[in-house]
Structure formats: structure tokens, C-alpha cells
Regions:
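Conserved AMP-binding A3 loop
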Residues: 121-129, 280-282, 289-313
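Adenylate-forming
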Residues: 158, 200-219, 241, 336, ...
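Structural core segment of the AMP-binding/adenylate-forming
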Residues: 172-267, 384-385, 390
Length: 710
């Protein structure tokens, strides 16, 4: 330990009893190697990729046929996107439901949602056996509707039981799932469905958020008439009772809507088939399983297709081997169906744990998640860094108000977790738990920098690089020096490509133009690969620390790599600023949200750091607050980090998944047209125009006469 090492905040009581340590011992013995530390194991897993992932398959008892070795071409670069387990056959849903046979009465899913004064459904507990039956029924409905391997099934609605059943039934047939959250605007949904042309749409009649009913049915006519190929069948789920609100009556909608293209069904009718056990169509490891859309802000959303086998074995690596989640655990990840954390959550079923679903606002009543944790004995709670920050401001004394008796891990993602919030969690929520800041994202539908139960937690750092991923920064072995996050070796959760995939994956692809397939694959290559070595570029700016306690190096994420700031040659990420300001002291001063970007000056040779600040209603950015911001940044970082301008704005633009958009706003304030930003990808596109005006004014004041970015 050196004086610059961050404080160790937690350490496992019994690291050798963790799954990762046991697997390392098994590998050491089997391969005659000595893997004494996590770092040894991580290095071995990166150097022996076929063997490592094959060991994960065996250790996890994956149901299916692994096929013979070799399991991957070890010489292939990430850019070659090699096929993994080329002869394997497996089914994702079969593996998620595999615990039903031995433990039919275990609770598989607890389905909960936000209440209103006139809508208070009790939590639904669904046993393993019941879940299998529900999937069999939904599968029968899908078969009757003609759904087959490779067809797309889309879901639009809340994170409720029927969404999970739809996902499981879709994948049981080898069909491809895609989902949009209930709060996605209809334009965003049109843009997604138009790209993937689903055969079947399952849609909720509405949901509750912020104690209000949000009906979706009124949006359906616009959706259907806008799609060039409306789904042949649409199934409507009564998540809100008909009588709640006359705008949401499913009966009226079913009677009133006849467009002749899509056939409407009630969920209850669609699944009206005998329960029993579904059939499982085993497909190839590299066959598509679901399509996620990236929250890119220019152009159409990227339709990222993930591979079946990778999604299965990597989730087991993540949840069981590195997270020690297993039967008896209750896993609650706060998510909507529009975020990749949805798949991350449902994949917890394969461990035998109970998965808790909650649909609604996590903060309208800030006690909500903590009440669920107490009421249902949640042991693993996943949330976002933003949520933890908000809780620290609006409901700080969680640990005094809640027992949190079984809680042993809190996972945080979505954006980097500031060091102060590590302190907050350990001081105000619970001391004896693993606080895992984790990072990955839509592009890989998983986590590749994250938690490991065998390792300590250091303040402000992600614990480790996950097994099987040769993560590095472009500053390479010069650890502690920030650089771009890259993956140096191929990995099995690399997406198959963007939709539409090459024809070998398209059973019904005869109507897809080759030019569209080629354009999608070219966009895929362009999105992630930019050097001759064929490394994967993830788009993050990161610092990987020296290894401590054998942890393979901790990671500090510093913002999107293309949002890197560089005033007077000092490179730093927006997170360096956010981590100072995301602090209850600033919330108390009225700061709600901030965004940092660079304004190019000196012909583009230099830039000035601009901090946009949104204040809570009725609060103004006064001189005292400005002074506090500057002095805090100066003392926490350096004088070079102090923004050249601090500007109050009415809103900070956010993607549908709640991410700030530094890169497009940087372009806008430097003169690029706002039309390049796709408004359907934002929660609050109306605020963009304000940034156009601010950009013009700032450029005029800085004497920038010609816009420097297009
Ligand atoms: C795991 C993640 O990285 C989640 C996200 O930020 O989208």
C-alpha cells in the first residue's frame, strides 16, 4: 500500500470460499498452473479464452451440447468477431428455467409495481413451476401466431411478469426478443420496430409512474399506421384495470380498432393454452437472441444483436462466478425493459435465485426500493449511480430507517459512482456489504468491469476487470494513466452485428436488401474498431490502477472517451467534475444536474470547459454558489479543472436511458446543427434549442467567427 492508494472500504470475510476462488483452484489443478490471486486467474482467462469459457460452461452445468474443442480461434482479433463454440446447441430459456425440476416450489419471480390511490395490486409471487407453466402457455400462443426461430417478438411496456414470460417464451422458440420501456415515446418505438419488423408485438395497456397512470393504448393507432410492416399479431396486456381510466379500456380499443393488418388479442386469450412444460428449440451459440438499441443520439438507434450462448454463459460468469448469486438469494435490479439491465436481471434466474421485478418510479416515494428490500429479503440490489446520488440527497438515512437484514451487495451502474457516494453508502446505508460499481453497457449487454466477491472494495474504484475480458486502456501498461477503454482479445459477448444481420442468420430475410445488410455491418465495424490491431473500442475514458490485493487493477471511469476535455493540454473526463458536484452539499444549494463540455477556441487548438447547471425549481445560480463550485473543483482537482464558464440552463438533455449527452452537446455549442441529434432518442429534446443559442452567444464572445464543428 502506498500513500496514494485509495482507502479500502470493505473486504470479503472468506475470499477462498467464493465461486471465483473455487473455480481458480479447479483450473489450477486441471491445467497444472498456479493461480494464486484473482489477477493470476484473470490473466489466465484472457490468455486461454477457449479453455476459460469452456470451464465456465462446465462449472455452471449449462444444459445443451458444447460440441468439441476448439471453442474459438485463439488467433482471431475482436474485429474478426470469431464464432464461439461453433458446434454447440443450447437454449437460453431452458437454462433460465432449469431450476424448476429440482425446486418447483421456489419463488422464481416476485412481480411488484408502483401504486396509486385507486390501484394497489399485491405483489405476485410466481413459483418456478408456475413460471414454467406460464412460459409454456405463452409459447403455445406464439406458435399459434406462427412465431418461429429467427422471427422478432417485440415487447413495449413495464417491467412486469408478462414481459419476463414473453422474453422466455420468445427465446424458448429460438426467436429474437426486443423490448421498449413504457416511457419510450411512440416515435422512439416506431424507429425501433421499423428496423426489426417484429412478427408479434406484446404491449401493455399502461403503467404507473410517479403515481400517475400512463396509458399506452392511445398511442397504438399511430404506431400501427406508421410501420411499413405492422406486426401480424398484437397482444395487449391489462396491466392497468379497464375501469381505472376510460382512456385505457382494452375492450373499447379491441372493438374500435380494425386496420386489417395487425390482429389484436388480449393476453388472457393469447395464453389460454394448457400449462405444462414448453419445448425448447436448441440453437447455435452464435445465433441471435435479442436486439438492443443503443442510446446513440445521431442517426437511427443502433440495433445491436446479441448472441445466445454468449448471453447465457457470460451472465452465469457474472452472477454466479463473480457475484456468488445462487438459490436462496433475492436479486432486485431496478430497471425498465428499455435498458440492458433488464436482460441482466432476468438472467439471474439461471442461478436459482428469486428475481424481484419492480415497475414504477424508484424515487417518487424514496423509501420504495428499501421497503421492497426489507419486505422481500433482497440480498442483491442493483441500481444506478444517479439513484444513489439522489437518495443521498432526498432520503439520506436509509440505514436508520430500514433493517436491510439480508442485503449483502449493492450494485451501481449507468454512470461512474463518485468516490463520495462510496463513503455515503458505507456510512449511511450499510457497512457490511459489497458495493460494486459495474460497467459494460448495451453494446455487450453485460458488465466487463465490475464486482468480484473475492476482492476488497476500494473507494471510488470498480473492483476489477472481469474474467475472460482482456480490458485495457490505450495508455496500456502505463497504469494509472487515463486512456480509452479497449478490449485486446476476442470475447464471446461481442454482438453478432447490427440488424439486419448477414443472411446466414436471417430465416425470413429474403425481403431484406443486401445494401441494408452491408450498411448495418459497416456501421458495426465503424462503431467499435479504429486501430490496426483490431481491438474493441468501448467509447469510455478510463484509468486502470496498479494491481492491489491481487485485483487485476481497479478501474476509474472518467466519462465517454469522445467527451474527453482537453483545456490547455490537460486531459480529463467530465466525471472529474461531476464527481465533485454530485454531493449533497451542492444539492442543498439547489443544483439538480450538470453537464460539462468543451468549447473550441483558438481555431480548434484549445478548448474552454463549460459547465451547464440545472437548478431545482425556484433556485438560482447565485454568486455564492458559483464560488463554491469553483473552489470545490479547484481543491478537489486543480485550478486547470475549473470551468471557464458556468451557465445556468433550464434542462440537461438526457437519453431515454438517462445518460447525459456530452458529445452531441459539445458539437452543438461548437456550431453543428441541432438537426443531427435524433430527438426520439432523448427524454427532453425540447431543451436542445437553448444550447444552440448559448453556443452562438459563447462563440461570439470568444471571437469564434466560423463554427468549428459540423
Ligand atoms: C452495465 C452498464 O454499463 C449499464 C449502462 O451504463 O448502460
Amino acid at each position: 500500500m502506498t500513500s496514494t492508494d485509495p482507502e479500502q472500504l470493505w473486504a470479503p470475510a472468506n475470499p477462498e470460499s467464493t465461486q471465483s476462488a473455487k473455480l481458480a483452484a479447479h483450473v489450477s489443478q486441471k491445467y497444472g498452473v498456479q493461480l494464486s490471486t484473482y489477477e493470476d486467474f484473470w490473466r489466465w482467462s484472457c490468455a486461454n479464452r477457449g479453455d476459460f469459457w469452456s470451464e465456465v460452461w462446465d462449472w455452471e452445468g449449462v444444459i445443451g451440447d458444447k460440441g468439441p474443442a476448439p471453442y474459438v480461434d485463439e488467433s482471431a482479433r475482436p474485429k474478426d468477431n470469431p464464432k464461439w463454440f461453433p458446434n454447440a446447441r443450447l437454449n437460453w430459456a431452458e437454462n433460465q428455467l432449469r431450476n424448476a425440476a429440482a425446486h418447483p416450489a421456489d419463488v422464481a419471480i416476485i412481480d411488484t409495481c408502483e401504486h396509486t390511490s385507486d390501484f394497489k395490486p399485491a405483489p405476485r409471487e410466481v413459483s418456478q413451476k408456475e413460471l414454467v407453466g406460464l412460459v409454456a402457455q405463452a409459447q403455445a400462443g406464439m406458435k399459434a401466431a406462427g412465431v418461429q426461430k429467427g422471427h422478432r417478438v417485440a415487447y413495449w411496456g413495464g417491467n412486469r411478469l408478462e414481459a419476463a414470460v414473453t422474453l422466455l417464451a420468445t427465446t424458448s422458440l429460438g426467436a429474437i426478443f426486443s423490448s421498449a420501456a413504457a416511457d419510450f415515446g411512440v416515435d422512439g418505438v416506431i424507429e425501433r420496430l421499423e428496423q426489426i419488423k417484429p412478427h408479434l408485438l406484446v404491449v401493455s395497456n399502461g403503467c404507473v409512474y410517479n403515481q400517475k397512470h400512463h396509458p399506452l393504448l392511445p398511442l397504438l393507432p399511430r404506431l400501427f399506421t406508421s410501420l411499413s410492416h405492422p406486426p401480424a399479431n398484437t397482444v395487449i396486456i391489462n396491466h392497468l384495470p379497464d375501469e381505472l381510466d376510460d382512456k385505457v379500456s382494452v375492450s373499447q380499443f379491441l372493438e374500435g380498432w380494425h386496420d386489417g393488418h395487425t390482429k389484436l388479442h388480449r393476453w388472457a386469450d393469447f395464453v389460454n393454452h394448457p400449462a405444462g412444460v414448453p419445448t425448447y428449440e436448441r440453437i447455435g451459440f452464435n445465433d441471435p437472441i435479442w436486439i438492443l438499441f443503443s442510446s446513440g443520439t445521431t442517426g437511427k438507434p443502433k440495433a445491436i444483436v446479441h448472441r445466445c450462448g454468449g448471453m447465457l454463459i457470460d451472465a452465469l460468469r457474472e452472477h454466479h462466478i463473480q457475484g456468488d448469486i445462487s438459490r436462496g438469494d433475492v436479486f432486485f435490479q431496478y430497471t425498465t425493459t428499455g435498458w440492458m439491465m433488464y436482460q441482466y436481471l432476468i438472467a439471474g434466474l439461471a442461478t436459482g435465485a428469486t428475481v424481484l421485478l419492480y415497475d414504477g418510479s424508484p424515487l417518487k416515494d424514496p423509501a420504495t426500493c428499501w421497503n421492497l428490500i426489507d419486505a422481500h429479503g433482497v440480498s442483491i440490489f442493483g441500481t444506478s449511480a444517479k439513484y444513489i446520488e439522489m437518495v443521498s440527497k432526498v432520503y439520506p438515512d436509509v440505514g436508520k430507517k430500514h433493517a436491510l437484514a439480508r442485503l449483502r451487495q449493492i450494485l451501481s451502474t449507468g454512470s461512474p459512482l463518485a468516490a463520495d457516494l462510496f463513503d455515503y453508502v458505507y456510512a449511511n446505508i450499510k457497512q457490511d456489504l459489497l458495493l460494486g460499481s459495474v460497467s459494460g453497457g448495451t453494446d455487450i449487454c453485460s458488465v466487463f468491469a465490475g464486482r468480484c466477491t473475492a476482492l476488497p472494495v476500494y473507494r471510488g474504484e470498480i473492483q476489477c476487470r472481469q474474467l475472460g475480458f482482456y480490458l485495457d486502456s490505450t495508455s496500456s501498461d502505463a497504469h494509472e494513466i487515463p486512456g480509452e477503454l479497449i478490449v485486446r482479445e476476442a470475447f464471446p459477448i461481442e454482438p453478432v452485428g447490427f440488424w439486419p444481420l448477414p443472411r446466414e442468420y436471417l430465416p425470413d430475410g429474403q425481403n431484406i436488401a443486401q445494401a441494408d445488410i452491408d450498411a448495418a455491418q459497416a456501421r458495426f465495424l465503424d462503431s467499435y474498431f479504429k486501430d490496426d490491431a483490431g481491438n474493441w473500442y468501448h467509447g469510455d475514458f478510463v484509468k486502470i490502477t496498479r494491481s492491489r490485493a491481487g485485483n487485476s487493477g481497479g478501474l476509474v471511469f472518467l466519462g465517454r472517451s469522445d467527451g474527453v476535455l482537453n483545456p490547455q493540454g490537460i486531459r480529463f473526463g467530465p466525471m472529474d467534475i461531476y464527481s465533485v458536484l454530485e454531493n449533497p452539499a451542492f444539492a442543498a444549494r439547489g443544483i439538480e444536474e450538470t453537464l460539462v463540455v468543451g468549447l473550441l477556441v483558438d481555431g480548434g487548438n484549445d478548448e474552454k470547459v463549460i459547465l451547464f447547471v440545472k437548478m431545482y425549481d425556484g433556485k438560482a445560480l447565485d454568486d455564492e454558489c458559483l464560488k463554491l463550485i469553483k473552489t470545490s473543483i479547484r481543491s478537489a482537482r486543480s485550478a486547470r479543472h475549473v470551468p471557464a464558464r458556468i451557465v445556468q440552463v433550464s434542462d440537461i438533455p438526457m437519453t431515454l436511458t438517462g445518460k447525459k449527452i456530452e458529445v452531441p452537446i459539445r458539437k452543438v455549442i461548437n456550431g453543428a446543427p441541432v438537426a443531427a441529434i435524433n430527438p426520439a432518442t432523448l427524454r427532453n429534446p425540447a431543451c436542445l434549442q437553448e444550447y444552440v443559442g448559448l453556443g452562438e452567444a459563447m462563440r461570439a464572445e470568444e471571437g469564434v467567427l466560423v463554427p468549428l464543428l459540423q
